[in-house]
Amino acid sequence: MKTVIVPAPGKIEIRQVGTPVINAYQALVKTEMVALCNATDSKLIAGKFPGVDTYPLALGHENAGIVVAVGEKVRNFKVGDRAIGGLISDFGAQGVDSGWGGFSEYVVVNDFEVLK
């Protein structure tokens, strides 16, 4: 899948990474909409987000999409639901450090952290 990566402060690229794999308590959401967050994304790109100094990292935490797969213990969502997510606990792309990743074709969301 494609995702937006900041390989180093001041640089942005679209990178091909593996589609994330969900666990029993997660859902896979196909991204349909994203929004740029000036308070977060612009600071991450500039290398000025407090406490973040490890690159490359994935951008985006304001995203919405459609649930395409659910883990066997997910109770709050089913395939076909529309969902919005917040921060992603584990982006899941090798070599990319981030708690974000909303600017990806697919995101993993935890059952207890997502709204529909």
Region locations from a protein language model:
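Extracytoplasmic/periplasmic beta-strand context in beta-sandwich domains
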Residues: 1-2, 15, 81, 105
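Extracellular beta-rich ligand/substrate-recognition surface
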Residues: 4-12
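Short beta-strand-to-turn element immediately C-terminal to the catalytic PLP-Schiff-base lysine
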Residues: 6, 45, 68-69, 109
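Conserved hydrophobic/aromatic beta-strand scaffold that supports enzyme active sites
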Residues: 14-16, 64-66, 106-108
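Glycine-rich beta-strand-centered segment in the early N-terminal region that forms part
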Residues: 20-36, 48-92, 99-101
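Cytochrome P450 core scaffold surrounding the K-helix E-X-X-R motif
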Residues: 38-45
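NAD(P)H dinucleotide-binding glycine-rich loop of Rossmann-like/cofactor-binding domains
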Residues: 89-116
